[in-house]
Amino acid sequence: MLICNDKFNPKTLLEEIMALRPWRKGPFKISQIKIDSEWDSSIKWDLVKNATPLKDKIVADVGCNNGYYLFKMLEYKPKSLVGFDPGVLVKKQFEFLAPFFDKEKKIIYESLGVEDLHEKYPNAFDVIFCLGVLYHRKSPLEALKALYHALKIKGELVLDTLIIDSPLDIALCPKKTYAKMKNVYFIPSVSVLKGWCERVGFENFEILSVLKTTPKEQRKTDFILGQSLEDFLDKTDPSKTLEGYDAPLRGYFKMLKPSKR
């Protein structure tokens, strides 16, 4: 949890926070108010925070949402931090949070998507985090290519995506929805993901962790609107989504942009 102990009018502060719902990433604590977000993002952060050194590095978070991971990265003293997310609400959340958690204004927030990286930030970053984005892209290869070109030579990508548990070179392409999400297009096996990454030029593909999503990590709270994980799973068999697919399984990976290709 990110904590700010400054004193504010609790009623006014809570009203501002609730007006910015839904809070997907967090939690945060401002004064005596805990923003109990849908996702306990500390679980994911604990899996990736030591993936690669960030000190004095130029670092990007692609799909940064409200900046939770960016605020966490400040503790590791990177040279610079840039977050990318085209979402309007999440930028408003970031602008609300930044005065509490980035008082020195070190974070740059760009309202851009992964597809904008190649043109606007070529060969720019030592490290890119791309967490929970790839399966939302209609062309995952193009997304990986954009990430590749935004990295410097010897730069590293830390990637989190939904995967399917299969030894085969296959990817799930949901017919209409996956766990009620309409914007999930491809969920690869690890071997397919490795092939995609190598095809665009990455090397040293490394599995950091594989973890099932549970209600401990994603659940309904007063700080979101609508449903959450338990509503997306088959109530008679929570190992399946409502559509009959395997329940969410996430893989965490690291890879390198080599010096020569």
UniProtKB/Swiss-Prot annotation:
Keyword Transferase in record: yes
- GO annotation terms (biological process): tRNA wobble uridine modification
Q: What is its EC number?
A: 2.5.1.-
Which positions does UniProt annotate for carboxy-S-adenosyl-L-methionine binding?
A: 25, 39, 44, 63, 114-115, 135, 250
User: A Gene Ontology MF term for this entry?
Assistant: transferase activity, transferring alkyl or aryl (other than methyl) groups
Q: Does the keyword Transport apply?
A: no
Top-level EC class as recorded in UniProt: transferase
Alphabetical keyword list: Transferase, tRNA processing
Annotated CDD domains: AdoMet_MTases
| Top-level division of the source organism's lineage | Bacteria
Give the matching InterPro entries: CmoB, Mo5U34_MeTrfas-like, SAM-dependent_MTases_sf
Q: How does this polypeptide assemble, per the annotation?
A: Homotetramer.
Q: What does this protein do?
A: Catalyzes carboxymethyl transfer from carboxy-S-adenosyl-L-methionine (Cx-SAM) to 5-hydroxyuridine (ho5U) to form 5-carboxymethoxyuridine (cmo5U) at position 34 in tRNAs.
- What is the name of the protein in this document? tRNA U34 carboxymethyltransferase
